[in-house]
């Protein structure tokens, strides 16, 4: 009898820990996404403290993103080789240590090195966390688990401008990074308690040649995207960077096809739902990821709001992200994946298009409402795409699928910010030859461009079968 009671206690404890896993993993994504945006509002004070030109601090942003993209592909291999629990805890530790170094930085060089360390931790933290959920939950529960992760993770970019402005204004820019320390320590503690070890019994040797080819391609293409709007960079250097990137990735593609165990396998693309979800998400994420970047600029540069007030106006975006969690499962059951992924991008496009009609006299309540509605539909889109990624993926391919999806998501983030910056630069030329500020015309034209990009993603999602994801929804 005592043995039976003990087993029931253990079973109840296990279910409780399993229930908390999505929230634990979500905070890893939250920290990574937060660090991608929170630094932007702190750049002027950082430049003053470090005695450098504010434009030089762009390296602190791009070094973090490049580090993320470069080391993401090896996260799946390390998780299979050493175990998901060990890698997830190590990733949080590295990320937290990098955050400490960022907060203690006294020079631009030290800050860049610290940001690279941060990126290495973040690169392994999110794909491994997502893999933990995919391996822990059955299809029926995976929809809800990944939905929770998507919602919490996307709060980072939404709250980044507000948090960065508040910390910089009332404390100092160092706290933009030091705030990660208590979150990281708690994450390590609960990861030890809640995560069960999971690794693949037989793991092939590490693909060094593939890592070099794939990494070189990603780094050079990301350099091209990050520096394309910088007039100080020669056109020749940009052309060479793009050419090296394309050649490296094409070479890797043919190399991987002929290798039994490549570092990153494109075999998940043979699964129709994964292919459509990832390629479609690349388009829609360009628009969605650009909003936390372009909206603070519009509100501060053209509407004259302070960094803190503009952050408050964008705060409803984060509330919209959270609110979607309570309706996503019902929407998926009622409409199915295909209908949602065809209708939702059009709604996103209409909202973004409406931003093009805003002006300095627009009501702050209208701005807040649009931000809330944008967050709501964007969260529905993220949750739907993320769960669809893995619904039909076989167990042996889940590690590769997780890494591949993460790389595409990071590329989409870079594309969103870079294309938005290029659009603002392009449409600003006729009206602002001195480049002292960005014209309202440039913002409005950029919103129209982003709306068209969002709507075009329906071309990809239309390839989904009507029955896509139906089995998982019927068992939820």
Regions flagged by a language model, labelled:
Residues 75-209:
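Helix-loop-helix hairpins in multi-pass membrane proteins, especially solute transporters
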Residues 1-34, 48:
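Cytosolic juxtamembrane N-terminal segment immediately preceding the first transmembrane helix
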Residues 62-76, 126, 130, 315-327:
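Central cavity-lining transmembrane alpha-helices of secondary-active solute carriers
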Residues 127, 148, 154-165, 218, ...:
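Glycine/proline-centered helix-kink
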Residues 46-47, 78-79, 163-171, 225, ...:
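Interfacial helix-cap and linker-helix signal at transmembrane-aqueous boundaries
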Residues 32, 61-64, 68, 95, ...:
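Structural signature of transmembrane alpha-helices in multi-pass secondary transporters
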Residues 170-280, 313, 451:
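Hydrophobic transmembrane-helix bundles of small-molecule transporters
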Residues 19-34, 39-41, 54, 60-61, ...:
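12-transmembrane solute porter fold
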């Amino acid at each position: 009898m005592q043995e039976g009671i003990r087993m029931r206690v253990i079973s109840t404890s296990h279910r409780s820990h399993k229930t908390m896993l999505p929230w634990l993993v979500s905070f890893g994504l939250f920290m990574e996404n937060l660090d991608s945006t929170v630094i932007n509002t702190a750049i002027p004070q950082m430049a003053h403290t470090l005695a450098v030109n504010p434009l030089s601090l762009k390296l602190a942003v791009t070094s973090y993103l490049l580090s993320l993209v470069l080391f993401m592909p090896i996260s799946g291999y390390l998780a299979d080789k050493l175990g998901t629990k060990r890698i997830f805890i190590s990733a949080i530790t590295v990320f937290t240590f990098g955050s400490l170094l960022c907060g203690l930085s006294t020079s631009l060089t030290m800050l860049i090195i610290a940001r690279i360390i941060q990126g290495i931790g973040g690169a392994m933290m999110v794909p491994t966390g997502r893999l933990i959920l995919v391996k822990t939950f059955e299809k029926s529960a995976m929809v809800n688990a990944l939905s929770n992760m998507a919602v919490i993770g996307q709060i980072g970019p939404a709250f980044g401008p507000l948090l960065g402005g508040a910390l910089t204004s009332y404390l100092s820019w160092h706290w933009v990074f030091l705030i990660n320390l208590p979150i990281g320590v708690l994450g390590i503690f609960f990861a030890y308690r809640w995560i069960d070890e999971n690794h693949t019994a037989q793991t092939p040797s590490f693909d060094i040649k593939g890592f070099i080819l794939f990494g070189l391609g990603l780094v050079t293409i990301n350099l091209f995207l990050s520096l394309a709007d910088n007039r100080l960079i020669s056109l020749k250097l940009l052309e060479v960077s793009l050419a090296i990137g394309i050649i490296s990735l094409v070479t890797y593609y043919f190399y991987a096809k002929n290798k039994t165990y490549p570092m990153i396998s494109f075999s998940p693309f043979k699964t129709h739902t994964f292919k459509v979800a990832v390629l479609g998400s690349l388009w829609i994420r360009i628009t969605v990821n650009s909003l936390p970047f372009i909206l603070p600029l519009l509100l501060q540069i053209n509407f004259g709001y302070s960094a803190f007030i503009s952050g408050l106006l964008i705060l409803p975006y984060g509330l919209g992200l959270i609110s979607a969690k309570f309706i996503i499962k019902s929407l998926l059951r009622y409409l199915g994946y295909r209908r949602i992924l065809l209708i939702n991008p059009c709604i996103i496009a209409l909202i973004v298009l409406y931003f093009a009609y805003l002006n300095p006299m627009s009501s702050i309540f209208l701005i807040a409402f649009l931000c809330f509605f944008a967050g709501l539909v964007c969260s529905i889109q993220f949750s739907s795409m993320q769960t669809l990624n893995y619904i039909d993926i076989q167990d042996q391919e889940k590690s590769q699928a997780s890494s591949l999806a993460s790389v595409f998501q990071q590329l989409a983030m870079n594309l969103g910010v870079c294309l938005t910056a290029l659009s603002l630069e392009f449409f600003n030329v006729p009206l602002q030859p001195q480049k002292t500020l960005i014209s309202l015309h440039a913002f409005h034209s950029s919103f129209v461009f982003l709306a068209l990009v969002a709507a075009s993603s329906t071309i990809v999602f239309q390839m989904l079968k009507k029955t896509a994801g139906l089995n998982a929804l019927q068992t939820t």
